[in-house]
């Protein structure tokens, strides 16, 4: 059976080959007939396009688009904790962001209509009002734990998917087991978009960490900001105003004040049975609610 030939845009192909700075002579050795694909005298199969993408180290999907997208500019628009400079971003993180941007570009073309909640709020809004709205959109009660039981991550993922948000989990670059994602570098990121918003979660994190990141990035969508999330729990928890606002909402959704005050004990082991978050988040919540003092914290 003959493989299906693809009508690849030659300008797109040439753009990414030149941008990769891979010498043409080397590419010709790695990919047979690459010159014929560039001048249009031959059409490549999907596997052959994949070979080119691998040779120039970009996602295959970029070569299948009808126009180029400048992923580097989009990547540099991200904010990180403490406004960290992104020049030192690992190739694993950079390639993962590119992969998600390609997926988003494709999905955007398949979807009609806009999502009205993306960018609906700002940090000047009352955080409790934002919490109420997010709960309404997710269709979850304040005491969601009764419904989620011990599967809170799956519970929220399904609720978020239902809103038209695409959620991806991975602990490596695509299927490459040699290119693992570093939890010390990032826990997740969000690509805000009115049609095809994407949340990516670093699967190397704990389940409770993944859940906190998932809700954290969801809140960023309601504010309409792209972000790479990286909070190491031993840090001093200092954020810019946007991060402080987002984390306040995230904590209230996952550990509602009314539910926490119902607990008769502040023993962390007991509280962990009721709330699917880390002990650090619980202690921080107790401090913010003035249930414990700064000294105890």
Language model regions located:
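Short juxta-domain linker segments that transition from a proline/glycine-rich
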Residues: 1-297
